[in-house]
Amino acid sequence: MQRILTRGEIETLDRTSIVRLIFPAADTFATRAKRLRELAPDNPIADYLRLIAKLADAQQQVFSQEHAIPAIDERQLAQAQAHGMPPFNNRNITRDKRWREQLAAIVELLLADGSLAEPIRTLLSSLRTDIQQQPELIEQQAEALLNVPAEHPEVKKIEAARAPFIMAALQVYWSQLVSTLESKQLPAHTPFGLCPCCGSQPVSSTVMLGGPKEQIRYATCSLCSSQWHIVRVVCTHCEDTKQMAYHTLEEGRAGIKAESCDHCQHYRKIFYLDKEQFAEAFADDLASLPLDILMGEAQFYRANNNPYLWQLAE
């Protein structure tokens, strides 16, 4: 039987032998779509999970297509190294129009699905029109999704119903960008709690199973899907180590918990592959909304949104 490491043992693990970063796999979005479909039956938001599975299918098709990805700017890499910052920081790199082309392709793939509900079809048709006729509006909405805190007045530019589709294209775009990187090109140290590749926050974290990653925790980037090592006894939001707690639903799955911090009053989900072998950072987070409700009732706040379900601050 697998032995669970104690807090002290976790803290003393040899970090030099730990794989720091895992880049997104070639089938990242296909794996996500498959998991969403597995989780849909008997789920309170089953229809939504199936819709997002279709969206992930479209992401995979676009992600797998040949695209002219610009060569890595050596000056950009040098600056990232010098300042300890992610090389493809979503806050300061200029997006090219390719991401809007990818958004258009995702929309067309979804509209080709005859089983799509009419309200979704109407939403996507409107989005397609704006991509063609108002690209500056789409850019403004993307900028707000990437960079505007939930409490900021500019958040009004975010259309919650459109957000998952716009974010889907941004995910594909950034996943392709970081796929051109090598681990050695990243700074040795980058800001805590942010993706070393693109500077985004994690959607959740996962405690791995098997091989050299056994019982090692990795946070999964909400934008580029890269995974990076974070010690298990640390709040992924504020880095506190002393006021952590773990929450589960009474009838929930044992491999899914909410990791909360009394210091900052925030939480993120954490998945344990020894108990939930096929857990996927985005899909299982989305499919466990009752746990989010429990955490809200306990006066904790989500550290950040799942990009497939945008919730505006009230």
What do these predicted regions represent?
Residues T6, T12, T16, T28-T31, ...:
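Residue-identity detector for threonine
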Residues E136-E139, A161-A169, Q201-L209, G296-F300, ...:
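Short N-terminal helix-initiation segments at or just after the protein's N-terminus
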Residues S17-E182:
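N-terminal alpha-helical interaction blocks
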Residues Q176-L294:
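Cys/His-clustered metal-coordination modules, chiefly Zn-binding fingers
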Residues M1-T31, E38-Q79, H263, Y267, ...:
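Charged, low-complexity interaction segments
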Residues Q2-I10, T16-R20, S126-E139, P196-S204:
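Short N-terminal signal/transit or membrane-insertion segments
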